Design a protein with these regions (language model features):
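Fungal secretory targeting signals
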Residues: 1-23
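Intrinsically disordered, flexible peripheral segments
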Residues: 19-340
Length: 340
């Protein structure tokens, strides 16, 4: 039943806009994205207020289970999940998705900054049991996104399909601006925001050495594959760091379909986009015009994406080609990074 619903929703999304997005303006003054701890206290407060603002606005996506604009983004990601992971357009689909979220914060909620990112590698420890990474500014209860969820014991093996060990929470977030009395989700059953910190995943999957390996890949196809690696936990992958390090077994961020329900999603994927952006800077003339990887998940011997492959994020924005999305200073996207 769920699969049928997903396929039906994907069909509807495909019809929303059949023509790639073409902006009439070029990027002349790109917002500069910064790491969370680079922001002042006022800038952090403004960003969080803008996220909360989205939850007060009426939805526009027309998708089931949406009560506000924040829900729109979660619903679009959820409906498209089967076709946007372990594919050649994974990184660029999510680049466009985060940029559209950033645009909504700025244009609909008056946010004056750029989308921040969370560089988890700065705090990853070689001591895999260390919890220091969860005691950093981004989890601050007053100026950050709050901390872990309440402890929930896992009694049904079906709730832990990957047999992950070391989970420390799983219930509703207990501190910060997204506790149940201040923030509720509505898509796919909704409820409170949940987190479930797993230190060994956060520390190992966020290691700078792993980022360096991803950024050492010689072409887009190998970069994209290294970014996601394989869909299990026998090998680390940086995409899984924030998702399963902070989302764990039972947390929102660890749910492949519903992960944008945690506002940290956009800072986590902002960092993955920064890593892509930095990789592109190594050979920008080439990497502004280079894509690869499968159209269908895991179909590495099948058809590959091309520069004119179209990305569709439903009613969140018009369609765009991968070539347009390779350029963060072009006719569709307009932002840059401060990596100091």
């Amino acid at each position: 039943m769920r699969l049928a619903g997903v396929l039906f929703s994907l069909a509807l999304l495909h019809l929303v806009s059949g023509v790639p997005h073409r902006s009439r303006t070029t990027c002349s003054n790109p917002p500069v994205r910064k790491e969370w701890r680079q922001l002042s206290a006022d800038e952090k407060a403004e960003y969080i207020a803008a996220v909360q603002c989205l939850t007060t606005l009426d939805p526009k996506s027309g998708l089931e289970g949406t009560a506000n604009r924040f829900d729109d983004f979660q619903a679009v990601h959820s409906n498209q999940t089967p076709s946007i992971h372990w594919v050649g357009h994974f990184a660029l689909w999510h680049r466009y998705f985060v940029a559209s979220y950033e645009k909504s914060l700025r244009e609909e909620c008056g946010y004056t900054g750029a989308q921040p990112y969370w560089n988890w590698s700065l705090d990853a420890s070689t001591n895999l049991s260390s919890t220091a990474i969860f005691e950093t500014e981004i989890f601050d209860p007053d100026t950050g996104f709050g901390g872990n969820g309440a402890w929930v014991e896992i009694t049904d093996p079906a709730d832990n399909p990957f047999n992950l060990t070391g989970h420390t929470g799983g219930g509703c977030v207990q501190t910060g601006p997204f506790t149940p009395d201040k923030f509720q989700l509505h898509h796919s059953g909704g409820g409170c925001l949940k987190r479930d910190f797993i230190p060994w995943i956060m520390n190992s999957f966020a290691a700078q050495s792993l980022v360096d390996w991803v950024q050492s890949q010689p072409d887009y196809t190998s970069f994209a594959r290294a970014l996601e690696n394989i869909p299990d936990f026998s090998e680390p992958n940086i995409h899984g760091s924030g998702h399963f390090g902070a989302g764990g077994v039972l947390g929102t961020l660890g749910n492949q379909y519903e992960s944008p329900g945690d506002p940290l999603f956009y800072l986590h994927h902002g960092n993955l986009d920064r890593i892509l952006w930095e990789w592109q800077q190594q050979d920008l003339p080439t990497r502004l015009h280079q894509v690869g990887g499968p159209i269908e998940p895991f179909d590495y011997s099948g058809k590959n994406v091309t520069l004119d492959f179209t990305v569709n994020i439903g009613a969140l924005a018009g369609n765009a080609t991968l070539e347009q999305l390779l350029n963060t200073n072009g006719d569709v996207l307009c932002y840059t990074y401060d990596t100091a």
